[in-house]
Amino acid sequence: MENVRNIVTEALGKIKERGGLKAVYFVACGGSQAAIYPGKYLLDVEAKNIPTKIYNSNEFVYATPASLDERCLVICCSLKATAETVEAVKKANEIGAVTIAMTGNPETGMAKVGQYVVTYSNGNDQIYSLGNQAQVLRICFEILHQVEDYPYYDEAMAAYAQIDEIIAGAKRDWLPRAQAFAKAYKDDTMFYILGAGPLWGTAYSMVNCHLIEMQQRNACLIHSGEYFHGPFETTGKGVAIVLLMSTGRTRFLDERVLRFLNKYADHATIIDAAELKLEERLGKHVAEFFNSVVMIPIERYYVSVMADERG
């Protein structure tokens, strides 16, 4: 935590000498982009004067935003050295922005090109409170604290001590649910995954990384708020649907979908962050920002149990 604080302090100090922070850009591909989305969500809803954008790495390279300059901070993420993301860091450096490379260890190709490097725990035995999602949130809470004197900074920092136990407890207590999901969905070939707000990146990860990439199962990513603008027309018997429900200010979107599914769907699973009592355990002002930190490991656990069921 101290390392992240020092990095943000130095990076912001450099930008302050150039006129002050203008914007924060988040750049990555695939699961890494899903992992850094919580940082963007946090700044979007809590920062008063810090605009953000998120880019696929190659799009950032080939359609570089004209607004990018030496007053911008670019946060890039890749476990090792995804070629497009390495090029994105180089592009940001070339333009004069300050870059933070998030990566799996200090010796990766990403670490070699970032002006600052933040490493994160990874792999099957990772410490989730030190994983990529947790670390990007540390960076962004620091930005909020140092630039706008964020009033809930201490509450956010205290929340990290609870994360690993919450995830371990959910895997233990929800094993019967995961097993029931596995038996009910193991033969499905198409999934509709819904989420919004702090769980939009979680839904992206479940679709693209855990179902399509790892299980070779077709899946469609649908924003809970967009569900009623076309996708709901396919809801019916036998359609495999997973709704990821968040806590916080966008929960209304998920609850509206839930009411519809309860009425018209017969093959839907709900994974609800509220059942984990996150506001009580993490703090009512910051819990929603940690939703994805907790829920990506849980949805992946569901898919993993289903993979075991399939053999």
Located regions from the model:
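Glycine-rich, charge-decorated loop segments at or immediately adjacent to ligand/cofactor-binding or catalytic sites
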Residues: 106-118, 230-234, 277-288
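Structural motif
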Residues: 7-11, 59-66, 228-231
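A short, acidic, amphipathic alpha-helical segment used as a generic capping/interface helix at domain edges
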Residues: 225-233, 252-256
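Glycine-rich phosphate-binding loops that contact phosphosugars or nucleotide phosphates
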Residues: 20-153, 157-159, 244-271
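Long, low-complexity, Lys/Arg-enriched
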Residues: 234-236, 240-242, 304
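Acidic, glycine-rich catalytic loops of TOPRIM or P-loop NTPase phosphate-binding modules used
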Residues: 50-58, 70, 218-229, 238
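Structured C-terminal subdomain patch of bacterial secreted/periplasmic proteins
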Residues: 263, 273-310
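Active-site phosphate/pyrophosphate-binding segments
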Residues: 2-23, 141-223, 228, 236
